[in-house]
Amino acid sequence: MRFFVLVSAVAFCGAVHAQEFPTRPVRIVTSAVGGTTDLVARLIAQGLTASLGQQVIVDNRPTGIIPGEIVVKAPPDGYTLLFSGSSLWMMPLLQKVPFDPVKDLAPVTLASSTPNIVVVNPAVSATTIKDLIALARAKPGALNYGSGATGASSHLGAELFKYMAGVNIVRIPYKGQGPAVLGLLGGEVQMSFATSASVAAHIKSGKLRALAIGTAKPSALAPGLPTVAESGLPGYQSASNAGMFVPVRTPARLITLLNREIVQALNKQDLKDLLFRDGTEVIGGSSQEFAASIKAEMANLGKVIKAAGIRTE
């Protein structure tokens, strides 16, 4: 009888915990309206609203340190989440920030990955990554590439390529990925590391030539296109990743619950199809896998940032 009472009490406590969250709206703080990060955050919010039975609101803030700063200072109760791209954990390597993304935030899940494709203007003779490396080595500083903001994946992806290949390719900065692609189309620059969504139509029309994709394995986003890694630079990866975080002291049971519900939302086929058309792959792994990927990316790109002396201040 005592055993029955004890088991019943434990079961009751579990049920109470399950009913405790959420009892009010949940907020996802993210960057400015527009772009892939905002899109994924909104799709997750829709899925969570349906599964949790509470409204999940997307709170857009200016891109930069503000979204992270808000969530770091929020109560660790699961009601304030942060959805951010790779720039969040790259920021401390590029500038001084008022918080530590690794120590002050707890990862929930890596939600999505938008890989970069190495594309060249057709005037460039290279048709493969090996050709491109050979061309760059033969003419140091003669080739250039266009990229978006300093520290963006299009910038760091190119610098990683230079670092691993041991070549000198000059950066031509643009205000964003769109202008960089226009510059590539117009012949202002010779190459770029761009998302499939931003260059797919131009590749199909023959206005740009794709050499390889920055994924670890061949991707359905670019059928038939080899990876940079298998084309001469083993271990190379370049993508803009995005995931969900909570304040660091958030209880493990809430992180587990949020992970389960977010991954469930991400695995819906209509959501996957929508993001696929945007050049984005759904990931949705565990919080431990996300933490490991952040650590690996920071270590990998940290060497590049230090060697190139890249700063955003």
What annotation goes with each model-predicted range?
Residues 2-12:
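Bacterial N-terminal signal peptides
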Residues 12-18:
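Sec/Tat signal peptide C-region and signal peptidase I cleavage site
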Residues 18-104, 142-144, 166-191, 195, ...:
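N-terminal (or domain-start) structured segment
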Residues 23-25, 163-164, 204, 230, ...:
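An extracytoplasmic/periplasmic, membrane-proximal ligand-sensing/linker region
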Residues 33-35, 86, 121-126, 148-152, ...:
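Short coil/turn segments
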Residues 48, 73-79, 93-179, 228, ...:
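Hinge/capping helix and adjacent helix->loop/strand transition within the periplasmic-binding protein
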Residues 87-96, 160-164, 191-225, 302:
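A ligand-binding cleft/hinge motif common to bilobed small-molecule-binding domains
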